[in-house]
Amino acid sequence: MKKITLILSLLISAYGFAQNTSTGVVTLNANAGFTVQFDVNGTTDIVTMTMVGPSNVWLAVALNTTGGNSMGAGGEDVILYDSTGLKDRNLTGAQNAPNVDASQDWTQSSNTVTSGVRTIVATRDLDTNDSNDYVFTTTNNSALPLLWAYGSGTNLAYHASRGATASTLSIETIALTPEFNIYPNPVTNELSVEF
């Protein structure tokens, strides 16, 4: 019975890990130190975004874009931080500032600045039921094309610094390789585990 319980608990914990996907740290612009990471928790249905970049400029990332290195086809989900704070926006498909979503679905958990580097952590539901928001998935190896941009100051304005990259939401790799001994085998009354 103890062996069955042990095996069952290992299988359940492995299943729980398999529901989490992540992009890992995606370098958007190495010279500026601009990165983003999306961690999707399939157990809680929450996605956590960590955006890191210079503290003296506005920063933006657009999700699931189809427009290559341009302003997208229109309607793509944008997360933008500027002098007014973190905003949920969407691309218009033209050379205009992204529209502010009527529903602000990102909740900023933290916004810290250390030595000129801003780190923003924000969360939201995987599916917000907002037609302007990207629906995150826990499916392994899901493609997530990204557009990025940042300005020359903290007020949203024209920018020349922008680009596109491809990312993938993959199952997080968790290294669990502890060495241990289990004895005696077979067990009669008492099982010993030595780490």
Regions flagged by a language model, labelled:
Residues 35-40, 107-113, 182-183:
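Short amphipathic beta-strand and strand-loop transition segments with alternating hydrophobic
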Residues 46-48, 56-58, 117-121, 141-145:
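Extracellular structured ligand-interaction cores
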Residues 20-31, 65-85, 128-170, 178:
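Acidic/polar low-complexity flexible segments
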Residues 21-52, 105:
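Early extracytoplasmic/domain-onset interaction patches
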Residues 173-195:
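Surface-exposed, proline-anchored Ser/Thr-rich loop/turn motifs
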Residues 86-132:
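Structured beta-strand segments within beta-sheet-rich domains
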Residues 39-91:
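Surface-exposed, glycine/proline- and aromatic-rich loop segments on solvent-exposed faces
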Residues 1-22, 171, 176:
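Bacterial Sec-dependent N-terminal signal peptides
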